[in-house]
């Protein structure tokens, strides 16, 4: 289900990228951004010697784009003229905002920049479909489409704001009522919507791919660790804790037995004799009461008395050593 949704998102992203670029390219290349009335088509405003046109003449209908204005009616019907954003009869302050707005409107930098970004974003989308493992390509495409949409909307705002500088030479009282926007303008606005949608989809695809890749890596790591033979062994921390506890127990047991008596027992009696004494008692355990004899009891008591005598002598020597040892 996730793969199906992602495939559908990728298909919509590809189609949206193509649609956004096509809409913006058509909008820039056509001259139907604005319908307005202009006196340029009947030749009344070609010379300024005759004065302004009569009030009844609103001008002939024209359609204009970003760079040209074309006449639909009048003497010059079917002819197109280059838009002059800076008429010679008007004086403009070069530091004014209107002059800067006319410069931006004349250059059409934002629509052109938007088209270039849309083209680059479409190329990134195509490369992302070819190199599906490269998630950064899809992210770059999303960023490019978002930037293209922002550039597009800025260009549209500038175009609307500079509508007073339209090539029609209408009087100020007629400028508010005798123009409307054409389908090229709406194509540009629709391109903005599609570009932003494609950008959001591309970023969403990148996020989902990143999550799936992280989950897959974690699952493979857990699977590899569970199948490893080291996973069946106790953990290092547990082993270290046990080793510490055992070392502490082994260190603590001599400390309990450290006493002059205990030390001198081992020092006074050789290990061979002690083992001999210990082994000498083994026959007593395995013999029965019928094999008891007074000679064996006398020999055992003699050994026991000897052991007690050596123990006392060793303890006496250790006490003397403790008294004579300087502090």
Swiss-Prot record:
Protein name: Voltage-dependent calcium channel gamma-4 subunit
Similarity section: Belongs to the PMP-22/EMP/MP20 family. CACNG subfamily.
Topology Extracellular: residue spans: 31-107, 158-186
Subunit structure: Interacts with CACNA1C. Identified in a complex with the L-type calcium channel subunits CACNA1C, CACNA2D1 and either CACNB1 or CACNB2. Acts as an auxiliary subunit for AMPA-selective glutamate receptors (AMPARs). Interacts with GRIA1.
Sequence segments annotated as region (Disordered): 235-261
Claim: Electron transport is one of the keywords in the record: no
PANTHER family found in the cross-reference section: VOLTAGE-DEPENDENT CALCIUM CHANNEL GAMMA SUBUNIT, VOLTAGE-DEPENDENT CALCIUM CHANNEL GAMMA-4 SUBUNIT
Expression by tissue: Detected in heart left ventricle.
List of glycosylated residues: 42, 45
Gene encoding the protein: CACNG4
Transmembrane segments: 10-30, 108-128, 137-157, 187-207
Organism: Homo sapiens (Human)
Membrane-side (Cytoplasmic) residue stretches: 1-9, 129-136, 208-327
Keyword terms, alphabetized: Calcium, Calcium channel, Calcium transport, Cell membrane, Glycoprotein, Ion channel, Ion transport, Membrane, Phosphoprotein, Transmembrane, Transmembrane helix, Transport, Voltage-gated channel
